[in-house]
Amino acid sequence: INTLIRYFGEYKKRNSDKIPDIKLVLIGGGEVNIPDTIKNDVIDLGFVDIQDKYDACAGAICLCQPSKNESFSIVIMESWLTERPVLVHSQCNVTSDFARESNSGLYFDNYFEFEGCLNYYIDNPQTASQMGHSGRQFVLDNFKWDVVLKKFMDFLEL
């Protein structure tokens, strides 16, 4: 989260003319230290009900999951179900592989790649929308209950 907040602050400084009203919306628990310079541009909602989470994802440019240590990211799947693309850290094999395999997200290794990816989504809303749609299809094709159950049964050869 610290990387995301730091990168967002830098993005605001460098791109204030491009999209001056951009906000970072945080959902979930935990203490977050938000620098005074961007306090007005970061909205920390804390825990919210499921519909509010889906609504927030659906209204976002993208979902950013900067963790390098995810084993499986439910929030990425939820974002894809709302047809929004994702932005993930390239050093997280699981999330970057999901983004590549599904053609539903971009990945970054440093601030300048983060900025480039975010600008790509902003400058190409139709492509971002198509990527989000691909993400939804990826989730439905691979993680719906009947699909998971069939994979499990096939694995057990039942």
Language model regions located:
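A conserved mid-protein helix/loop that constitutes part of the nucleotide-sugar donor-binding site
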Residues: 1-12
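Nucleotide-activated donor-binding/catalytic signature segment of Leloir-type glycosyltransferases, i.e.
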Residues: 19, 33-54
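Short acidic/histidine- and often glycine-rich active-site loop of Leloir-type glycosyltransferases
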Residues: 35-36, 77, 91-102, 107
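Aromatic "clamp/platform" in nucleotide-sugar-dependent glycosyltransferases that forms part
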Residues: 68
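Short hydrophobic beta-strand element within catalytic cores of glycosyltransferases
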Residues: 85-89
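Conserved acidic donor-binding segment of nucleotide-sugar-dependent glycosyltransferases
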Residues: 101-112, 120-125
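A short, well-ordered alpha-helix in the C-terminal region of glycosyltransferases
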Residues: 120, 127-141, 151
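C-terminal alpha-helical cap of glycosyltransferases
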Residues: 145-158
